[in-house]
Amino acid sequence: VAETTIKPFNLSVAKNIIGPLAQTNHFLVTFSSLTPSVENYLADYTGIKSIRSFLSRNVGILCNEAVIPTSTLATAEVKDNFMGVPQQFAHTRFYTDFSYTFYCDEDYTLLRIFEGWMEYITSGANDDVEQNHRAYYRRMRYPDSYKCNTMYINKFEKNYKRTLRYKFVNAFPKSIDPVPVSYGSADILKITVSFNYDRYIVNG
């Protein structure tokens, strides 16, 4: 009879072998600035004059939840290299969107910033027709004018021995989730924003 390699073990043994496991509640989101075009538009659209200062100081504190993105590979199948053995080869790498959930301050600053950012992206026709006009239409801005390269998420542990830093290249807000409000017991208002980007770079 062949000797089995399966042996019982408990959590203390596993912890000694594997070591401490990563925790979900140690992270920091940083977001320092937008493009000058977006910042200037937001200053007029929202009346917020210190957007860069607000983002650099407050985003990390107000971010309640974040999603670390991943990627997938699109493949093509080849059947002719080896008889009866299909093979797949990668041809494109796709990156999943990432999202941040923020606490909303009583001035609704972040909600106004992200709404204004998306408004800027779609406001290319504003010089042609007023928004209140029945013939108003949307024209998209050039990507270089609204995509930014200052969004990061840092994943670390409480001992700070190891940090993973994700940099998002050419990020912009793709959607804002509906924000529910209701009568009853009060709760903190939160907004969740999903972002698209070209790719991410991981350092760590």
Residue spans for each PLM region:
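Glycine-rich, low-complexity intrinsically disordered segments
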Residues: 1-204
